[in-house]
Amino acid sequence: MKELLQKYENKSPEIIFNWKDPETEAEGWTVINSLRGGAAGGGTRMRVGLDINEVLSLAKTMEVKFTVSGPAIGGAKSGINFDPKDPRKKGVLERWYKAVSPLLKSYYGTGGDLNVDEIHEVIPITEESGVWHPQEGVFEGHFKPTPADKINRIGQLRHGVIKVIENPQYSPSVARKYTVADMITGFGVAEAAKHFYNVHGDSIVGKRAIVQGFGNVGAAAAFYLSQMGAKVVGIIDIVGGLIKEDGFSFEEITELYLAKAGNTLVSDHLIPFSEINEKIWSLKTEIFAPCAASRLITQDQIDHMIGTGLEVISCGANVPFADKEIFFGSIMEHTDNKVSLIPDFISNCGMARVFAYFMERKVQMTDEAIFNDTSETIRKAIQRVYDKNQTKTGISATAFEIALTQLV
């Protein structure tokens, strides 16, 4: 696995596209790690201090993710070094997408990512540059559909991603019009933990869980974990957190979901961050779902949780550990050897899978069909790992080996 990983990490990407905005200090990159299967996919992010190395490592990560979610294409990523709060943001994105539009018409598919919104920015702005849909390049390069079929599948994709959830089983409140895109990643994080317990002949019911981060992913993960019978005992967010050792009820978790302001936890009983960050890691818990920013979790925090009975980690965040390596750093390796660490590219592949589902062929557009497809994709990936490794450790190492064998 280590040799495969080194080979994969050190291989130069096929395409690097570099852009400097003529009107501001913005600079952007698209890195296409490979045109596996004729195309590549990966979102567009924006933040101050972003550099080409960040974009490259994310492109490599996307390629690994596609081995689970499909389609069987290469990984890519776009990044713009610019302040997303700057009022000139829209102009920067307009000029960026104009420059990158030939790639988007031919072999590169993109979407929203950190500080770039799929629905309000990516779709309308790429459309102005003559791109039918941000994923058009994946249709062109990989699926090669007939013109009529392409129109049909682009329609499916457009409606599917912004589809409002009508089935109360999948939504904290149907009246609030939450979309598939809002909920699917957190759903996958919860399902991954559930399937892992099932494949090992155990059940998630009654297991205690700590969720880190209460944005789209963390809040949805807490909602679905609670719904399936796990007991959420702690939530830690950037502003603070909450602890309830005998577990919050499903109603309480649903209320917290509905009360969150944007990506932030809101509660009258909020424990300040400095205090919760001391306490939460030594709570008794079986499940940990890191769903905040990347590279936050220290070995010390993990060891505390292992000491109080941690069993399974299901990653909502990409690379949640504070390692410098792209993939398999020392904290991750240490954790993988001690507990069942389900890697990000399995547990958080929900959104990528939804894209693949709508692109592959004409499909059912019901909530149940969409969510079941993601659940089944994650279940199969966990089953493949189990077929190679029936123990409860080395899960991530086994998963990487399965993925990299397809790529190297």
PLM regions and their residue ranges:
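Glycine/serine-rich phosphate-binding loop and adjoining beta1-alpha1 elements at the start
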Residues: 68-72, 77-204
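Short, Gly/Pro- and small/polar-rich lid/capping loops
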Residues: 1-20
